[in-house]
């Protein structure tokens, strides 16, 4: 998309600009669009996450790949972050679960499509709620949870559980490191023995254990 041309056109303006994610799951491309606008003097920036195109068969129209959105959020925590569950899901039946997941991850808002008569909408009819359904979703079905708590009981319990996770993570990293060393030795042994990288029977045996 022609981000630089848009950035040039917006020079000298004082309007908020929200940058949707690129079609492909490319964090640097998303950040690059934000940086171009920022260099053009656009200071009121925000982002909209609507999922990424994928060749995999998934329940949603677009793949959320939340890890990319979370990474962008961690790098630029000051940016308002909205999620578009309508386009991400591609159907009204997914709007609630995507919306709740977005709020649980701490994103600021949602961009949800609504239409007075969705069946007569010229485009994307399957993903549009009626105004009444939107009202019910926002005020009756979704929950905004606290980001943190000052409760001593909460802090004690969460610190205890996180300490357990830290120990498990250390053990996992050690085990993975040990596995990599053995894998490297196997690779060297195959090379020295003039053996192909892949033995299908071994690969099938590994998959059978999963």
What is each of the regions a protein language model found here?
Residues 2-136, 140, 149-152:
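Catalytic alpha/beta core domains of metabolic enzymes, predominantly
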């Amino acid at each position: 998309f022609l981000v630089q041309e848009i950035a040039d056109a917006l020079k000298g303006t004082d309007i908020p600009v929200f940058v949707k994610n690129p079609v492909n799951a490319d964090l640097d491309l998303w950040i690059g669009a934000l940086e171009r606008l920022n260099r053009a003097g656009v200071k009121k920036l925000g982002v909209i996450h609507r999922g990424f195109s994928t060749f995999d068969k998934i329940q949603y129209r677009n793949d959320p790949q939340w890890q990319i959105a979370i990474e962008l959020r961690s790098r630029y925590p000051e940016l308002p972050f909205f999620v578009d569950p309508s386009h991400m899901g591609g159907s009204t039946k997914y709007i609630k679960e995507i919306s709740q997941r977005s709020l649980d991850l701490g994103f600021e808002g949602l961009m949800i499509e609504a239409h007075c008569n969705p069946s007569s909408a010229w485009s994307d009819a399957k993903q549009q709620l009626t105004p009444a359904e939107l009202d019910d979703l926002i005020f009756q079905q979704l929950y905004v949870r606290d980001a943190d708590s000052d409760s001593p009981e909460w802090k004690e319990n969460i610190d205890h559980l996180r300490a357990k996770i830290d120990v498990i993570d250390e053990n996992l990293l050690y085990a993975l490191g040990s596995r990599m060393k053995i894998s490297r030795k196997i690779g060297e042994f195959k090379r020295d023995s003039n053996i192909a990288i892949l033995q299908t029977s071994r690969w099938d045996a590994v998959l059978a254990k999963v």
